């Protein structure tokens, strides 16, 4: 497999369940393209010039969560993100495997990955 470069992109499929889709334009499924190398501080806005190589890391789920917050989330950020990661009560699956078995936010994304977010909390 080729080494990622700053211009390589990853195509990621994102799915929502348990009501989380309501925060994301009421769409259960999204497809996003993200850079394969991203800023170590998880900044998602384009900067000119791009960060130096020593300030980059492979795109991981933590970056994906920041990207979703900044570009897909339509309302009530506090229902999805807390302290830079997903809130407690949100189950995250990476290619049908619990993200806790994959390293949680440190999981390095690969082209074609599917990431599913399911809220296990329901109001009443």
Curated annotation (Swiss-Prot):
Renumbered to this chain, region (Disordered) spans 34-53
Post-translational modification 1-thioglycine, affected residues: 124
Q: Where is this cross-link: Glycyl lysine isopeptide (Gly-Lys) (interchain with K-? in acceptor proteins)?
A: 124
Keyword Protease set for record: no
Fill in the PTM field for this protein: C-terminal thiocarboxylation occurs in 2 steps, it is first acyl-adenylated (-COAMP) via the hesA/moeB/thiF part of UBA4, then thiocarboxylated (-COSH) via the rhodanese domain of UBA4.
Which Gene Ontology biological process is one annotated for this entry? tRNA thio-modification
**Where does it mainly reside?**
cytoplasm
Any one GO CC term of the record: cytosol
Organism superkingdom: Eukaryota
- Pfam families found in the cross-reference section: Urm1 (PF09138)
Q: In which pathway does it act?
A: tRNA modification; 5-methoxycarbonylmethyl-2-thiouridine-tRNA biosynthesis
Concerning InterPro entries, the annotation shows: Beta-grasp_dom_sf, Mopterin_synth/thiamin_S_b, Urm1
Gene3D superfamilies from the UniProt entry: 3.10.20.30
Tell where it localizes. Cytoplasm
Q: Which UniProt keywords apply?
A: Cytoplasm, Isopeptide bond, tRNA processing, Ubl conjugation pathway
Q: What does this protein do?
A: Acts as a sulfur carrier required for 2-thiolation of mcm(5)S(2)U at tRNA wobble positions of cytosolic tRNA(Lys), tRNA(Glu) and tRNA(Gln). Serves as sulfur donor in tRNA 2-thiolation reaction by being thiocarboxylated (-COSH) at its C-terminus by the MOCS3 homolog UBA4. The sulfur is then transferred to tRNA to form 2-thiolation of mcm(5)S(2)U. Prior mcm(5) tRNA modification by the elongator complex is required for 2-thiolation. Also acts as a ubiquitin-like protein (UBL) that is covalently conjugated via an isopeptide bond to lysine residues of target proteins such as AHP1.
Its family remark reads: Belongs to the URM1 family.
Q: What is the protein's given name?
A: Ubiquitin-related modifier 1
């Amino acid at each position: 497999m080729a080494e990622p470069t700053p211009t390589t992109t990853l195509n990621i499929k994102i799915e929502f369940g348990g009501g989380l889709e309501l925060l994301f334009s009421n769409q259960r499924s999204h497809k996003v393209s993200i850079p394969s190398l991203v800023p170590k501080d998880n900044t998602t806005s384009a900067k000119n010039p791009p960060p130096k190589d020593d300030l980059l890391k492979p795109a991981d789920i933590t970056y994906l969560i920041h990207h979703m917050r900044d570009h897909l989330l339509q309302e009530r950020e506090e229902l999805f993100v807390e302290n830079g990661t997903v809130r407690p009560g949100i189950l995250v699956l990476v290619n049908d495997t619990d993200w806790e078995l994959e390293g949680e936010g440190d999981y390095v994304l690969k082209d074609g990955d599917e990431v599913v977010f399911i809220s296990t909390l329901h109001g009443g």
